[in-house]
């Protein structure tokens, strides 16, 4: 896909702040600091539309990025970040659940995991949650540039087996550094547009 226009449209914490209209949305989920913002920036050929941070837990709102005036990427707060209070975690959970279970514009969730490590318990819980609600999911195994090419298949197998990925969901090897998997990711997303 050729992205000619991309802008942050809305930062929201509750449904009444979500953008109006019926444009399709793709939510980006994953643990804190896994590379959701880097994924957005690579996909749209921008250096820093989505702010990246080395500090986990930076994204605290649902950030809606309007792409080509035809759909949104929705960056959701990362999970599994230890240094937030129980109260904040509960508020986060409620915000996420509300969005994922009630938003009609949501077409699919892009679940981003780190190829270097087996998916965490939080990754597994997130994937099971998405499957429970029958939300189509595209799994992006990112940071492929940090794993030797000869070990990619072995690492992908661990991701596939740990998450117990169903046949309909696509698993894509990705690198925000090299652009590996970008075309495949666009092809997977375009199926839902």
From Swiss-Prot:
The keyword Cell cycle applies. Disulfide bonds: none annotated. GO terms for cellular component: cytosol. GTP binds at residues 30-37, 57-61, 75-78, 142-145, 174-176. It holds the Pfam family MMR_HSR1. Keywords: Cell cycle, Cell division, GTP-binding, Magnesium, Metal-binding, Nucleotide-binding, Septation. Necessary for normal cell division and for the maintenance of normal septation. PANTHER family: ENGB-TYPE G DOMAIN-CONTAINING PROTEIN (PTHR11649:SF13), MSS1/TRME-RELATED GTP-BINDING PROTEIN (PTHR11649). This is Probable GTP-binding protein EngB. It comes from Geobacillus sp. (strain WCH70). The lineage of its organism: Bacteria, Bacillati, Bacillota, Bacilli, Bacillales.
């Amino acid at each position: 896909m050729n992205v000619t226009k991309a802008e942050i449209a809305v930062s929201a914490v509750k449904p009444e702040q979500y953008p109006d209209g019926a444009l399709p949305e793709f939510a980006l989920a994953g643990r804190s600091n896994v590379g959701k913002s880097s994924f957005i920036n690579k996909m749209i050929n921008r250096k820093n539309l989505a702010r990246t941070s080395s500090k986990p837990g930076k994204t605290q709102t649902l950030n809606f990025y309007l792409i080509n005036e035809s759909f949104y990427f929705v960056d959701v707060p990362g999970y599994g970040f230890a240094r937030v209070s129980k109260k904040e975690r509960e508020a986060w959970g409620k915000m996420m659940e509300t969005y994922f279970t009630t938003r009609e514009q949501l077409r699919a969730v892009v679940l981003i995991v780190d190829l270097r490590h087996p998916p965490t318990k939080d990754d597994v819980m997130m994937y099971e949650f998405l499957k429970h609600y029958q939300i189509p999911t595209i799994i992006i195994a990112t940071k492929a540039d940090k794993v030797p090419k000869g070990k990619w298949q072995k690492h992908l197998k661990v991701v596939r087996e740990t998450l117990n990925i169903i046949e309909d969901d696509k698993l894509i090897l990705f690198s925000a550094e090299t652009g590996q998997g970008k075309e495949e990711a666009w092809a997977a997303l375009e199926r839902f547009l």
